[in-house]
Amino acid sequence: MSEKPKLVVIEGGKRDNELIDPKANGGTEIQARRVFSEFPDLVDKFNWVLSYPKIDLDPNKPSLLWMHETPFDQGIQQQFQKPDYWNQYTQIIFVSYWQQQMFHILYGVPYENSIVIQNSIDPILVSEKPKIDKNNPIKLIYASSPNRGLDILLNVVESEEFKDIDFELSVYSSFKLYNRKSNDIQFENLFDRCKKHEKIKYYGTRSNEEIKEAMSNSHIMTYPNSYAETSCITAMEAMSGGCLIVCPKYGALPETTSEFSWSYNFESDKMRHETIFKYVLMEAIKNYDQNNVKQMLKLQKVFCDTFYHWNTKLSIWEQMLTALHSQYNEDPQTPTPEAV
């Protein structure tokens, strides 16, 4: 029987004494903290790698790679271009089927060595949306890092076509969420534009609870994303919060929003993207109060609260971890994740 590959910290991963940065509150951290707190005993039976190895791995434990990053990330490319890198792991957990397929196509990761468990949220309570009339503008929201389309959004709402549209845009955006404050420097001009615009409220980084409350009090999530996301928790929260989502068909966004979003074909040309997004958003604002849109948003919430609910996904996590632990104990040299 062949010797099991040695588990090491791969070059490009960040060494740290803690698996999860205690000051970071991005999607990866939120998801990991929840799973780890729900099943501490099961979790402790494995080595965990959250996209990048951060701590030394115990060679006496099976290792799981929970991949949140895109296959195009430079550090990820460095890892997966090494022969049989993925063989170090008993199982690779992807957060979307789009992501799983891309890793298979680009790096040859076998489907039988991975599983998809989509990200999860707790449903958002929505009592009643704010009314829209001559004294109460339609409420738009952007809640993501600034590199995911904030520049396109600002160009649109500052355009001539939007001068006569009564709207209020709330912007929650900063790399402080990921404990990467220094990354904000290159986006300060965008933040300044937000602060100077009379129809925009800039909040920077706020707690996830505050973001969810903001979703429940907003009408449209404006998201002209130009970054190929592997999953979008913000979109899930917008769906549960009853927001109409305007976004491109790019990365895993079509999978996450599951045809409920007002989406459009992605354009790599920034000017074309901006133009298309502008007119789709204008149509969304114009038609938001239509009965068919309201019915769609109700169905959207039911879908999201059913399939992205933590209660739904936690049972899948428990089943997978239990099965993998049992299989590893039976034959630690040849784990069979395809049985999960």
What are these regions (language model features)?
Residues K131-G149, L154-V157, S170:
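Conserved donor-binding/catalytic core segment of Leloir-type glycosyltransferases
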Residues N47-I76, T90-F94, I115-Q118:
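Active-site proximal beta-strand in glycosyltransferases
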Residues W98, S120:
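Carbohydrate-associated surface elements
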